Amino acid sequence: MRKTTISLVFLLLTLTAWCQQANYAKMSSMVRQLAMETTGRMRRMPSAGDRELCAFVRIEGNADSLLALYGGRSLARFGNLHVASIPLRSLSPLSLRPEVSRIEARQGNSIQMDTTLVLLGGAKAHAGELLPQAFTGRGVVVGVQDIGFDLTHPNFYDTSLSEYRIKRMWDFLSLDTLGSDLYVGAEYTTEEALKTYAHSRDAHIISHGTHTLGCAAGSGYDTSYRGMAPGSDICLVSNAVTEDISLIDSADVYKYTYALDALGFKYIFDYAKSVGKPCVVSFSEGSMMDFRGDDALYYEMLDSLVGPGRIIVASAGNAGHQVAHVVKPVGMESARVALISGGSSGYFSVKTTSDDYMLDFVLYGPDNARQTYLLRPVDIYLRSDSLLTDTLEVGGKPYYITATRYPSYYNAAEEVVEVIVGTDKRLGLDYYAGVDLKGENVELEMFRGGGYLVPEDESLGSSAYSIHSPSSAPAVICTGATGYRTQYVNYKGDLHVYNKGSNGERSDYSSVGPTFDGRVKPDVMAPGTNIISSYSSYYLEACPDASDIESDVEHFEFNGRTYAWNSNSGTSMSTPVAAGAIALWLEADPTLSRDDVMEVIRQTSRRYDESLEYPNNFYGYGEIDAYKGLLYILGLSDIKEISDHQPAAVRFSLSEDGRLCLGFPHPYAKPVMVRVFATSGTEVMSTQVLPEGGMAAVDLGALPRGVYAIQVCASDQALTGSTLIRR
């Protein structure tokens, strides 16, 4: 009876709302648009309001009862902040409730691969140069929220193939929903269930997650292409982004928002908590920042999710080689910017503290037809809801211009005008489209939203403010990409060259800061250009002629299927590399918080260009150094006798009975000093060895079990350095 009563109240409330205004000021732009569209559609078709939106909502008081009155429910709660499912018909009436102060949702994530080319193999990350012997991520959960997972790839076993390391997965797009308590999709929680399911639903159209997971936690199988934390446990969330949206039923499309991604992060952390292990989550997705504050509650939720032993790492974005910011200074009468998009529309924002300016559009059509369109801020202000929409025809070619204005979320003294320019075909490519920023007495800042900005005066443009969200969030560790190798040979024997920097130089595509509220981002860098990792056998099977298959470096058979190792580039790759390094640190200290990790990064990162001040908006604090970070966490970095780097040309192995073997370049046969330090800093052994046949051995069998630093000193600098071993 109670359920029936609530349903009747819900119907009455939503029907009454047709005659009321919504409080649009409480809504993010997507929620506002959905509320307005739904009100109109419901007049024609009442069932249009039945679809659900997954949103962030701030509610004071009894949120469960309030949401139930409007047909909604809370899916997760942190204080007065909820992730909630809300029928579209309820958005307007819910916004009128005094208990509700904000409703927020956003879509538009895309994966962060460098789409210029997809090439090569990142030796620094995956040939073991950063990997200490004593720490492999054991006892740590590495979470990856991504798309396109092949759960059967041997990279996700241990090296002996005796342990399957994926412990569970939530697939947002799974159709196995019968009996599932999850908001969307289904979870797979046993080895048998995971292997039977075999792959995320989208793995036949994309392999992104298979690659990023390998970067973070792959064992390498029988190759050197291992991830940073090959001993870790794995928990996955296969979410939904632009690239796999075609698999979503149109009735459910508004369930797949950033709020649902937040539930994905929570799912991974909840699993780690249930098994009593620390966790780092890698997220190689994102979208452009905005001035509307549409991610404000998202950032609060992320801040609530992280803590001691709970870290989120996200990709900076791959827009660093594009103009994202144009400045027309005071004293300059105008600055022309071409507008280009591979699609039919593009959008940009203009920010300033004055209304004393104009946007003068110059649009072309067939037969050299030309037309201008003058847009002043006051024109927008005079329209209802501060929304201007206009259409033009230039030589038979249609254009439409939509503009809105609002105060910047980050500084209310600054006004933002947001403009969408659209046409019937590719904007600015078939016929020129541009805008003159006019106003001699005012500085105008123009920001890229969608499409591309090409200033006539190149000196006015830069890649500043190109960092993506959610890596722009204060609680998230934002990772940019560096380059090392510049060429590779694919599985066909073809040589490919892709030079995006060497020796740890920032790859030009890696997005740069600051954030719109002025914070330095990225936080850290990691190898991201030309990284070799695992690729989906199901994608290879379904799309054998896809362009990215050309960057496969090897195909091999395992359990009757053909798998691949593939080269890829982007901050999508650097992010899991950084996350895997942090997993090693969490193994050393499971209580590390985000601030603790940032302090390790600040103290130990490698700085490519010492002439720069750090942190900066290109490199953050520098490139992550997993080994040097471990020395810092273990308290060994201040012991001058211990090098802060591993010997480049020495390989170590340790037998169960404590015999430490050192491999040297043959035929090196000069004396080598080996010193052994406990983590207390005490030297517990010192001996000199003479390599024979490129090998030498030291017996550590008498030492107690534990972690030790091994310092090797030789006349050859490549043979000098330290490593960590676990006795």
Describe each model-derived feature in a short phrase.
Residues 688-716:
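Short, surface-exposed loop/turn motifs with a glycine/proline- and acidic-biased composition
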Residues 129-259, 276-280, 307-309, 323-324, ...:
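Subtilisin-like serine protease catalytic core
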